[in-house]
Amino acid sequence: MPILKSYYQDVYRSPVVRLDGYSGRHALAASVLAYLDFGGATGTSKDGLAETMLAFAAERGTLTPGMPVVEASSGSFGAALAVSCATTGHPCILVVPSSLPIARRQRLQELGAKIVVSSNGSRKAMDRIAQQTAQRYNAYYTRYFSNDDNPEYHRRVTGPQILKAAGDAIDAVVIGVGSGGTVTGVAEYIKAWNSMIRIV
């Protein structure tokens, strides 16, 4: 196995696996394929996304060398962003709800993030604190839930990877929805290739 130059090198080569056992147990006529997007340092689907969002911002000049990065996230994107910031030389500040378990906070800190705790865990309240924090530290606020770089990553990476692996075999793509970035980017890419493919 070759030595990787960075942990991102394998993030962009997520495997697609045929689930023959699942299809057999449920007597399905169709094949079921699974896109396994967990090859990065945090073991989540957000590693490549976080790195790419920072790269896009740097290309535009909105993220400059050494500039702090802020996000309101206590989940997988926050963890991935902390690692991406650590590897690119950006301080990472994460706004998290007070309800977040201490162990989760400690993990984010171990990944290099500074934690700002919000007593109100609503998305609106955390976004407001993140905006204030970004202004205070002259930082770049990634705005994961509303940043167009989120679906753009999936147009450029996830959609093409799925299509390259499955090709003409795709009849439908089933996607879980969180921020909406994956389903938006993948759907737009795949529908442009074949408008008959169903997005579920």
Give the location of each predicted region.
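PLP-dependent amino-acid enzyme catalytic core
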Residues: 1-200
